[in-house]
């Protein structure tokens, strides 16, 4: 039991020392606007997560990095705390399902991305969540529309 406890303590010390939280920007009141997290790899610190906040301290954007590029699930929120958008990234580009929501929490848009480009059928909803239209971006000439969480 003591060996397990010692292992847990040592692991937490090593992990705690290898990940660094850096407040990169603040608001006038001193509260964080952008926090980035870095881990130690090969003697240097590498970006692995970014969190952006509104002035009211509500989370605005949160996502992971791999090899300095956006990777995995990224989420964005309205200032009121409701989810605004979520989507998957791979190698810094949107890939997979993307969903955006109205500020009231109802679904607004959903569809698929491939290398930052909208592909396949996209569905659009009104503020009550009722489907209003569908667009097949594979059939729309010149539809190389690029989107990204900003």
Which ranges hold each PLM region?
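Sec-dependent N-terminal signal peptides
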Residues: 4-13
């Amino acid at each position: 039991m003591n060996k397990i406890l010692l292992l847990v303590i040592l692991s937490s010390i090593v992990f705690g020392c290898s990940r660094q939280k850096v407040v990169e920007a603040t608001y006038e009141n001193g509260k964080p606007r952008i926090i980035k997290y870095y881990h130690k790899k090969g003697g240097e610190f590498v970006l692995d997560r970014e969190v952006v906040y509104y002035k009211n301290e509500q989370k605005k954007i949160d996502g992971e990095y791999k090899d300095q590029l956006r990777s995995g699930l990224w989420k964005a929120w309205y200032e009121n705390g409701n989810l605004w958008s979520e989507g998957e990234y791979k190698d810094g580009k949107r890939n997979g399902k993307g969903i955006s929501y109205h500020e009231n929490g109802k679904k607004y848009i959903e569809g698929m991305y491939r290398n930052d480009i909208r592909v396949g059928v996209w569905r659009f909803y009104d503020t009550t969540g009722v489907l209003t239209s569908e667009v097949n971006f594979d059939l729309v000439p010149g539809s190389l529309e690029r989107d990204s969480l900003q």
